Amino acid sequence: MLAVFLQGFALSAAMILPLGPQNAFVMNQGIKRQHHLMSASLCALSDIILICAGIFGGSALLNRSPLLLALVTWGGVAFLLWYGWGALMAAWRGDSSSAAVAAGTQGRWRIIVTLLAVTWLNPHVYLDTFVVLGSLGGQLLPDVRPWFAFGAVSASVAWFFALALLAAWLSPWLNRPGSQRVINLLVGGVMWFIAFQLARQGLNL
């Protein structure tokens, strides 16, 4: 059981750790010290739902529909290109806040809506949870499959809360204009890199 748990934990961590829209959003809220723990909680809850759905049946549905998989892939390409463009433009203009959210103080509900959009309207999330985690978890025996899901979920929860708390702790340094420009450049570059990788996968479908 422990080996299966660690397998799920390691695989989930490998996909979550690279910078993506969710990470950029949570990091930005941590830097601003604005509802950062709530943001981490919503990201973790969304991942729990998506990971469990992928491992316990959603992956088979996606894999049986090449058209749906293609739509998810190319939707992810478009989303990531748009998101990366916003980050690069923020870096070019020298905005003092990350492109993950608009500048200025936001209300709790606006943060919730933005975070849900960043998570649930990002098709790359479905590729990670349904195609990768779902395909591998779905091949396991039914009695050990929950342990794989538990490991994957644990990695997600631990990462988002660690990221939010670390960003809040480093806020005095990361909230400077120069640091924000570097962050925006990094976010934009990574988003476009992931988009081009997804496009290559889409051409091979």
Curated annotation (Swiss-Prot):
Record field: transmembrane: 1-21, 42-62, 67-87, 111-131, 147-167, 182-202
Protein keywords: Amino-acid transport, Cell inner membrane, Cell membrane, Membrane, Transmembrane, Transmembrane helix, Transport
GO cellular component: plasma membrane
InterPro entries according to UniProt: Arg_export_ArgO_enterobac, LeuE-type, Lys/arg_exporter
One Pfam family recorded for the sequence: LysE
GO MF annotation terms: L-arginine transmembrane transporter activity
Record localization: Cell inner membrane
Coiled coil residues, start to end: none
Catalytic activity line of the entry: L-arginine(in) = L-arginine(out)
Membrane topology category: Multi-pass membrane protein
PANTHER family in the record: ARGININE EXPORTER PROTEIN ARGO, ARGININE EXPORTER PROTEIN ARGO-RELATED
Family: Belongs to the LysE/ArgO transporter (TC 2.A.75) family.
Role according to the record: Involved in the export of arginine. Important to control the intracellular level of arginine and the correct balance between arginine and lysine.
Record-given protein name: Arginine exporter protein ArgO
Underlying gene: argO
